[in-house]
């Protein structure tokens, strides 16, 4: 993507991954109500401009809606899966204060994030085998240098049980 437009750095992967707000699983929808003019909504405008892309990147399951110039004072509203609504007043707050406040009330804590990261690392370990949903490889035959699956390529006679049993039977006779 070309580096054109206002603050194209906002669209870089490094900038998007720097966001530190990962919502709890119960957050489903986030609405941002703000005004494009006025002194009191400056923090909300900067929040929308700089921080919403980071939140979208870190929380792809959350629907984010923006409402411009429809309210006298800027606020955020979160809809949870239990049907509850959380209202956050952002009038007179800076975009950093808004991010910190959201992270504190609806974000996952550091311990939970660390546990999830550790779990993800364990699941993606190359030595684990199982269904694709949980592991990188389904079978040992996918590893280079290993014997291929008998269903794909027949095994040599020396490696088959029937052949070995027949050899033993012939040797005993």
UniProtKB/Swiss-Prot annotation:
Pfam families: L51_S25_CI-B8. The keyword Aminoacyl-tRNA synthetase does not apply. One of its GO terms (cellular component) is mitochondrial inner membrane. Keywords: Disease variant, Mitochondrion, Primary mitochondrial disease, Ribonucleoprotein, Ribosomal protein. Its main location: mitochondrion. The keyword Ribosomal protein applies. Signal peptide: none annotated. One of its GO terms (biological process) is mitochondrial translation. Gene3D superfamilies: Glutaredoxin (3.40.30.10). It is found in: Mitochondrion. One of its GO terms (molecular function) is structural constituent of ribosome. It comes from the Eukaryota. Belongs to the mitochondrion-specific ribosomal protein mS25 family. It is linked to Combined oxidative phosphorylation deficiency 50: An autosomal recessive, mitochondrial encephalomyopathy characterized by intrauterine growth retardation, poor overall growth, delayed psychomotor development, hypotonia, muscle weakness, progressive loss of ambulation, and mitochondrial oxidative phosphorylation deficiency in patient tissues. Brain imaging shows partial agenesis of the corpus callosum. Component of the mitochondrial small ribosomal subunit (mt-SSU). Mature mammalian 55S mitochondrial ribosomes consist of a small (28S) and a large (39S) subunit. The 28S small subunit contains a 12S ribosomal RNA (12S mt-rRNA) and 30 different proteins. The 39S large subunit contains a 16S rRNA (16S mt-rRNA), a copy of mitochondrial valine transfer RNA (mt-tRNA(Val)), which plays an integral structural role, and 52 different proteins. PANTHER family: MITOCHONDRIAL RIBOSOMAL PROTEIN S25 (PTHR13274), SMALL RIBOSOMAL SUBUNIT PROTEIN MS25 (PTHR13274:SF2). This is Small ribosomal subunit protein mS25. It comes from Homo sapiens.
């Amino acid at each position: 993507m070309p580096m054109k437009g206002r603050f194209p750095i906002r669209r870089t992967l490094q900038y998007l991954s720097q966001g530190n707000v990962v919502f709890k699983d119960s957050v489903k929808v986030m609405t941002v109500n703000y005004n494009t003019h006025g002194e009191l909504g400056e923090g909300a405008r900067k929040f929308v401009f700089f921080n919403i892309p980071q939140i979208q990147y870190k929380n792809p399951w959350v629907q984010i809606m923006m409402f411009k110039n429809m309210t006298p004072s800027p606020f955020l509203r979160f809809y949870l899966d239990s049907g509850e609504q959380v209202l956050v007043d952002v009038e007179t707050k800076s975009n950093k204060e808004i991010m910190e406040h959201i992270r504190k009330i609806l974000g996952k804590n550091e311990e939970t994030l660390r546990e999830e990261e550790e779990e993800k690392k364990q699941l993606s370990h190359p030595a684990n085998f199982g269904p694709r949903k949980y592991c990188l490889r389904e079978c040992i035959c996918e590893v280079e240098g290993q014997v291929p699956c008998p269903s794909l390529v027949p095994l040599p006679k020396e490696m088959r049980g029937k052949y070995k049993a027949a050899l033993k039977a012939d040797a005993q006779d």
